[in-house]
From Swiss-Prot:
Known role: Catalyzes the oxidation of 5,10-methylenetetrahydrofolate to 5,10-methenyltetrahydrofolate and then the hydrolysis of 5,10-methenyltetrahydrofolate to 10-formyltetrahydrofolate.
Name recorded for this polypeptide: Bifunctional protein FolD
UniProt xrefs under InterPro entries: Aminoacid_DH-like_N_sf (IPR046346), NAD(P)-bd_dom_sf (IPR036291), THF_DH/CycHdrlase (IPR000672), THF_DH/CycHdrlase_cat_dom (IPR020630), THF_DH/CycHdrlase_CS (IPR020867), THF_DH/CycHdrlase_NAD-bd_dom (IPR020631)
GO annotations of cellular component type: cytosol
Gene Ontology molecular functions: methenyltetrahydrofolate cyclohydrolase activity; methylenetetrahydrofolate dehydrogenase (NADP+) activity
Pathway participation: One-carbon metabolism; tetrahydrofolate interconversion
Gene name linked to the record: folD
Family membership: Belongs to the tetrahydrofolate dehydrogenase/cyclohydrolase family.
Amino acid sequence: MTAQIIDGKAIAQSIRKQLSAKVTARKEAGKRVPGLAVILVGADPASQVYVGSKRRACEEVGFLSQSFDLPTETSEADLLALIDKCNEDPSIDGILVQLPLPDHIEESKVIERIRPDKDVDGFHPYNVGRLAQRIPVLRSCTPMGIMTLIKSTGVDTYGLDAVVVGASNIVGRPMTLELLLAGCTTTTCHRFTRDLEDKVRRADLLIVAVGKPNFIPGEWIKPGAIVIDVGINRLESGQLVGDVQYDVAAEHASHITPVPGGVGPMTIASLLENTLYAAENYHD
């Protein structure tokens, strides 16, 4: 068996085209274009790349993108004041603060300062709570994008044994909630998990988000499983690899995401979808 590749790049491009058409229709109807504020604190190279991609994606679909690049030494109070300003700006539908933040700034305080109706990253406790209660509105972008990828396979998720490896607030925990909502019997694995191999081998649907190159051996993959690899790791050779040993896993799986070109583009597409949703449902 050779797995079908789930082409996140192509699916994300299709979503962007649809969003662009909706923005054009809004303008023709005399409505304003959706606005996204992107806040970057410091000069972390990876964060700069991610932020650049998000800003370009905004422009591509016709959103208004407002950029705030702040120095590393920016105080927590100054960052919170900027968020307050964006909260009150009627031209801004979504506020994105690029994580991680410098050590002197408390992430949870920043996330909770963003108004829930402008929390297009889906990190605010209100929005995570709505997902937990099975009434999601603004959903965490990476898990939301992953659900779109899974849907693209045409496989019915109800009753599947799903395993999530990684329990971060950004991916693992909201991913578990998304899979429960999709009717899966879901196991979340983390650093205290015993016998990880046994759990992975049982997975009809495997999602790995740990940030360790080739962490899951390919031979652990159950024949016919769907494999979603969230990791993106650069080896010393410069090669980008995921958290799953791709070549061997692709021999066992029915569907698999590549790295790069799998989950990454979908995270940005979901961010754009959330921003349009916020504009249409909260701010029009």
